Amino acid sequence: MDYNELRETYKEFIYKSYNIEETEEKIRVTYKFEIVGLSEFTPYWEFPKKSGMGQIAENNALFETMVFSLGMVELVSYWKITCAPLVRVQAGALNEAQIAWWKELYFHGLGEFYYTNGIEVKQDDFMEMVSEGNAPTGSYLIKENLKGCMVPIGGGKDSAVTLSLLKEQKDSNYCYIINPRGATLNTVKSGGYNQDKMIAVKRTLDKRMIELNQQGFLNGHTPFSAIVAFSATIAAYMNDLKYIVLSNESSANESTVAGSTVNHQYSKSFKFEKDFHTYEETYIKSGTYYFSMLRPLSEFQIAKQFATCSEYHDIFRSCNVGSKEDIWCGHCPKCLFVFFILSPFLSQERLTEIFGADMMNDITMLDTMKQLIGLSPEKPFECVGSRDEINTAICLTIEKLEAQGKELPELLEYYKSEGLYEQNKGREQYYFTYYDKEHLLPEEFDKIVKEKCYQ
């Protein structure tokens, strides 16, 4: 369906309300959104309560502010169905600076959505937002003496590396999972954490949204890591935890489309991390502290670190295609990227065991390789490392295999025959010693990264 026609037909989107139901076992939050003239949507979240927590939400303006804010990021999944030009926020109150903050998140967080749907928009006119609600009444129940870490677990190598770096703090660590699945649960287990140390929340999508997507309404990527940030703040507050420890690396800052600001990983970027940190400190004030443990590192360094974490090698999963079946599909850009980035540090035989496919010998992946290494203007719309890092990993693997007297796999043979090895070799020292100073790590965590990753 045409973007302009949809905006003309469905001119208003309303964030109507949120409802909080609390029992001894959980807190359930139900949101109500409406595309005027098309449909209402009522997605919900469930946050588990540990025994003895007592009443949390009742008459707690801080908790309501967190819930309202999660709704603000949740709404974009429903707004994008028609991209209504007017958004009316009736569920709470926002000032002009907050409205500008949310619009910036939506605009950049939907960069891939606009690009893949062929939509050209400008930040100053893609949406008008008006605040029509009131701030919550009740006490602003700030918790003192928050301590410990909560690590969001995605099931891939990055959160496994964060857990391994925080091994000595294990007694005060918790793992945070949205909608548990095989790889996330296995990561928690392999890290040596039991059920008591896992905070598993449930997020639902309204079925009506899926129906409308199937009917041809607009669909595409939304800033999921922003959902993680706002929901994790609620979970950390409920469990008296100070630090929300993400696993986003420096390479997440690179744009997906060369020469543009379109970034599949925008809400994993340092810009979003800083922006969220400022927003939370200014408007929510939960007392939690959100930062990425791996921000100083490149994907290359993370892969080197992960290669030493053998307890996770058979259970980690990053493949979106195979995520529902908890497998590596062995044919997508994400699988090929992870295969390449680990190839200097693990043998080809071991990688073939892990992925169930010898991907470097699969010539049908040649076009995907070209995207990953920068021979195409766009990187795949996946969470993958920078083009230079992937080239460096391939060069190191070629060096390793030739030193061992082994025949090069087909993709690496092509790479070398095209002169790419000569063009890109010799950069590894830069990535082995790379340290991005743009990060928010508290000193004690920065010290851990420096001690364990720069030897």
Where are these regions (language model features)?
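Short helix-capping/linker segments at secondary-structure and domain boundaries
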Residues: S77-V89, A236-I244, L342-E353, E399-K406
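Active-site adenylate/phosphate-handling loop in enzymes that bind or generate adenylated species
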Residues: V228-C309, G322-W328, I341-E349
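Catalytic cores of extracellular degradative/oxidative enzymes
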Residues: T204-E211, Q215-F230
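RNA-binding accessory domains that recognize and position tRNA/RNA substrates
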Residues: M1-G148, L165-I178, G182-D206, F217, ...
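Short acidic, glycine/serine/threonine-rich loops at helix termini
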Residues: L163-S164, L185-S190, M209-G216, S255-S260, ...
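Hydrophobic/small residue at the entry helix of a nucleotide-binding pocket
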Residues: D158
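ATP/NTP-dependent adenylation/nucleotidyl-transfer catalytic domains that generate, transfer
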Residues: D2-Y31, S292-M293, A307-Q455
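Short His-Asn-centered micro-motif
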Residues: P152-G155, Y176-P180, V201, T222-S225, ...
